[in-house]
Amino acid sequence: MKLIYLGAEVGSNRGLLEGMGIKTMGISYSRIVKRGEPKTKLWLVSERFEDDALVVASPGISETDGMTVGELEDFAKAYREFIFNNESRLSGVIEFAPPALGPEWTVAQRELYADLDERFWPVWNPDFGFRNLVDLTNDYQEIAVPGAEVLSNTAHQISGHMRSATARNGTLFHGLGVSSPESLIQTPLATASTLSWTQGMRNGETIVWDGTRLVRYPARMKDQARPRYKSVIEQAGLDYDAILADDNKEVTRLAIWSYQQLEKDMDKKKPGNHPFTVIEGGGDVTNSDDFEMELSGNTDVDVTNRRSSVERLGNPPPEPRKA
């Protein structure tokens, strides 16, 4: 399984990730816009990321209520221009398909991204039914599925369709907004994106891999939690004293290192195991709103010739589009 570390549009975040050897990162177009970037020049992945970085772009808009049709269309146009300006350096592009603009608009927009081939990931709308999901698997190698559906009462049906499509066409699936570790294991999704690695510097959480699972402690428990993992922290090559002193950068490095261990461990897990725990006053919570799934799916079916576009990022980037 491959984790996609979100928030890499922020330079300081990107620096921490690169310093820990992270290569697979996610950027949000809406967050770039909200940060007021760029002001006088194009925002280019090639100028901000290392050459071997694996970058996935998403619209970054989860709630479109309140936006008019015109505002949605304007955002879609701006997002499309952003993607084409960065096309040669993107591994994956998550579709912007607000239901308010309707299925005909969505289909027409997909044609505009045809040159991206497997790097364009259409989003299945459950309102269109399973027949539509099957149709998408016949047309696209990689498909995004809303996380709410992965966790719904029909999750077993969706999972069945996913497995069938993977066996039939080598289709890879991308779960959007899945927060349940159980779903990470039981659903045929192979990569997940998360912003949770920033919780230490944002909210004072302690995120640590204890050797068998990822454990998250709220800020109020950091003084009692961090000393428990002194040997783990030191063996990871991190500065225990800095973490004890609540140094934001070192606490964040601990979180990144811990997610790296989770990523390795998830490949070994089978349904029923829980490699992720949030400690809230001593209780285990197996769901976390901060753990987001946005990316692709894989199963034990041999799809050697149908590699995810994230995996392909290690190859030379495609030639830039001709004007």
Label each PLM-derived region with a short phrase.
Residues M1-Q109, A114, V208, L238-D246, ...:
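Non-catalytic, usually N-terminal nucleic-acid engagement modules in DNA/RNA processing proteins
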Residues S58-P59, T68, L72-M201:
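Eukaryote-skewed repeat-based solenoidal scaffolds used as protein-protein interaction platforms
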Residues A148-E149, S179-R213, T277-D290, P320:
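Glycine-rich phosphate-binding active-site loops on the catalytic face of alpha/beta enzymes
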Residues D210-E250:
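A conserved mid-domain beta-alpha-beta active-site/ligand-binding segment of alpha/beta enzyme cores
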